[in-house]
Amino acid sequence: MATIIRQSYIDKIERFLGKETIIVLVGQRRVGKSCMMKMIRDRKISDSSNNIIYIDKEKREFDPIQTYQDLNEYIGQHFHSDKHNYILIDEIQDIKEFERSIRSYRTEPNTDIIITGSNARMLSNELSTIIGGRYKEIYIQSLSYNEFLQFHHLVDNDEALALYIQYGGLPGLAKIGLEEDDAREYQIDIYHTVLLKDVIMRNQIRNIPFLENLVRFLADNTGKLISANSIAKYMKSQGESITSTAIINYISFLCEAYILHKVNRYDIHGKRIFETNDKFYFEDNGIRNAIAGGTREGDIEKVIENIIYQHLIRLGYQVYVGQLQAGEIDFVCTKPGGERIYVQASYIIYDKATREREFGNLHAIKDNYPKYVISMTPLLTKNDDDGITHIHLRKFLTEGL
């Protein structure tokens, strides 16, 4: 199978090489961080003036590298001062006090460092404490719809979109295939690996059954406003007693492993961020569907909202849930410099009541920022309704806004 290059990420990485900046590739396991690093390695290795030091902590041959002393020794043995050194370390969080090595080699001339990791808290805390702002974090997401088409050799049509909605964008599915049993088995395996290595072991969690029940609850309630208290009450009704503090901690651990994303509420009129009642979305809608038992009746709205959220992040927006006095906006999206848009996500707008709900809340916002409704309404490509742009999901995923 030919290697498919995710060029936008490669371009981001290349922009920061040679600038004395540590490049940190972050994201959930199995979304393609290792492949990005290998692509950079393969590009640089062909130049004889370069020296590549490559460490993959998921390979047994690198098991002896457990501490920063081990890392220093390995790099020192392979470092060539007469060449441009590229130090590439995959899943670096598995090396104790790795940041001490990174700090020492960052100041070496003609040296670039690229590392990957699957734990947000550990990477940001250690790197920011030790080396300050001299690093660039690049977030790697699961496949976009356009990438999904490329990886699976599909033509853009309704059938391909249905497959993307159902199975999501884990790159490894290109080898596994999109037969339901095989795809779901692979997704559950990845989910269990993330849960074990990046949540349970990393945070020494003992109440594993509750953690699994919590993830299922969040999968069933994707895109709904949720508080720790509401989860605690639900769990109590199911015969399981747990504190709100423990729930907050567990959710934080899931977000740090990038399997889950928390979206805060934003008061559109008061222009402030609320501290309670957030929404949660999954990194990959295929994993979300596997956890929830597939896309059941009534789930399609949740999955579409999850896909739209992820693509808005991919387009570079900071995303919030919009709160009105008498309603809600699915997404308030901002960029540095003052850019803002409002987005409502819907499945199919099939009657007047649905139309009034989706468009009415946007009409209630009395400013001039762009407003969008994204849906799968048949025969729709893109149209304008009194200043609100209605766009089909496929067009949004292939062309943006």
Give residue spans per PLM region.
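Hydrophobic positions on the alpha1 helix immediately C-terminal to the Walker A/P-loop
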Residues: 36, 40
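Interdomain motor-coupling "hinge/lid" segment immediately C-terminal to the ATP-binding subdomain
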Residues: 118-120, 125-225, 229
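Short glycine-rich substrate-engagement loop in P-loop NTPases that contacts/grips substrate
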Residues: 53-83
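Accessory nucleic acid-recognition modules appended to NTPase machines
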Residues: 179-339
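Pre-Walker A adenine-sensing motif
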Residues: 2-17
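Hydrophobic anchor at the beta1->P-loop junction of P-loop NTPases
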Residues: 25
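Conserved lysine of the Walker
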Residues: 33
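Domain-level recognition of nuclease-like catalytic cores that cleave nucleotide substrates
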Residues: 378-401
